[in-house]
Amino acid sequence: MTFARRGARTATVAKIGRDVRGEEMLRTLAKEGVVTRFIAKDPFRMSAYSVVILTPSGERAILTYRGAEKELAARDFPKSRLYARWFYLTHLSGKSAALFGTILRHAKAVGARVAVNPGKTQLRMPRHRLQPLLKLIDVFILNREEASYLTKVPYAREDAIFQKLDSWVPGIVAVTDGPGGVTVSDGSTRWSAGILKEKRHVDRTGAGDAFGSGFVTGLLERPGNIPYAIQLGSANATSVVEHIGAQEGILGKRDSILRWGRLRIREKRVSA
């Protein structure tokens, strides 16, 4: 939804059930200007949904039913009609996980760039299957715990984590660290920033996704400008934290990304 609100022509490929919840999803996406004709409908399973349990501090527990979402199959991925400048992949679970490589290879075949915010299913793939696919990724976004798990490098050894990730991913790697901010590397330069201070802390649901989509949107708006992408991603995440739910606070084209101030972004060269 971030891409559409920021003015990019956006479509989504997904699977929903033939139910009231699925129809509401379609209406919401259409209202935001997202093309929905590539969304498949499963006649046997309900649409995915989540129940979010919030604490007074804004932390939360999320109970998720994946439903039709995890049943996306090759027949639901219309390769002959999918052409874009960018593909943005998030968690593919269940049967849908089998499409991970298919989507990456299709994106490269049509000359698109690919951003991936992986889920547990992708992170748990056997190394010999995952590493060739990482070579197809232009922007890889994950949190520090996930980065430590994937690389098998202790959480505290940030430099070693990035050395491995940079050797696997030819493009940009962004590792978020909650209150610790974010570090981004393109293999030769590393950028680090803290976080923007929200005016009110309501709900952290969707903050990570908001950073990821905001970061990639920044690269669409200003190609190659990583500091701008970090600022936009951080502002988008901060805005989402100030609202209930994962969608309400997503920034639009006219929203200032400097509302919470300008991030101090540190830059340093790193050896290959």
What are these regions (language model features)?
Residues 104-105, 110-113, 119-192:
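Conserved phosphate/ATP/ADP-binding segment of small-molecule kinases
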Residues 3, 143, 208:
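Short, conserved phosphate/pyrophosphate- and ester-handling motifs at nucleotide-, phospho-/glycolipid
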Residues 5-89, 256-272:
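Conserved N-terminal subdomain of the carbohydrate kinase-like
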Residues 155-272:
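Conserved phosphate-binding/catalytic region of the ribokinase-like
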Residues 11, 88, 114-115, 174:
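Structural detector of well-ordered beta-strand residues that form the stable sheet scaffold
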Residues 96-103:
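Active-site-adjacent beta->alpha loops and helix N-cap segments on the catalytic face
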Residues 69-77, 98, 123-128:
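Active-site glycine-rich loop that binds ribose-phosphate moieties when present
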Residues 4-5, 220:
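Gly/Ala-rich phosphate-binding loop of Rossmann-like dinucleotide-binding domains
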